[in-house]
Amino acid sequence: MIITNELNLPAPFVDAATSDYKYTPKRYSVTSVLKGVREAILQRRHDDEIEQDAADMVWAIFGSAVHSILENSQETAEQLKENWFSVDMGDGYELSGIFDLYDDATGTVTDYKTATAWKVVFGEFDDWKRQTLCYVWMLRAIGFDAKRGEIVAMLKDHSKTKAKADHTYPQHPVYRIGWDFSEQEIAECGEWLRGRFEEIKRAEALPDDELPMCTEEERWHKADKWAVMKEGRKTAVKLYDSEEEAQECVEEEGDKFYVEHRPGDDSKCRDYCSACAFCSHYKELINNVD
């Protein structure tokens, strides 16, 4: 990856954003396999061409700093911390991962995260759950009796004022959540991972434009909506999934009402995919807007 410095930030800041990481053929990390196959492969293929500005990597730097501090802490006799490991997935492919802490006494694998308070407010934990489940499966594969995943998240935008005013808002700037995984969940995770590597294997032979499309979930897709609006009012009276339903509502309400189309979007593609410049779907998205 090419790190730019549009704000002319001090060299130590840019150095912190720069990584000498190089992709290893046929080795995919847990975070990579949980992305869309298209995104994961495009990132690898175009790593030497992808540009990112140091100023846009501030939270990645913050996350790395947190991990570095916690890495130097003392674990107990039953705990392992900051361990890189890999599992053979067949045909020369490997699944790799780094867990932050594993407690052998409880079978719990813990990962430290930085996140927004709103992630907690909205209960958007599926990605965390999937990641720790993958770690549990991997630890099982190398002989540990792992059975629980846990996230300890530092909430970078936490507000004491909001915490005092709203009991549903996270009450502390650190949030802890965990999941006890059943034998069935762990087994199904292994089946999914093996299937994922089969997808990757097939996709690696395809040119960029023929790579399988990321799913709507992987693209963070929001569908088109049709808003019923009223003259003199800025917010929608009601939102509909189809233009026909919205039009029926307008006909019932009368002359002062009208339909406004609100196009859907793939926000991951638009704002959070580092390989978007090499993706035909992204190019189509921005061309449609233009």
Where are these regions (language model features)?
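Metal-dependent nuclease catalytic regions and adjoining charged, substrate-binding loops involved
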Residues: 4-5, 138-290
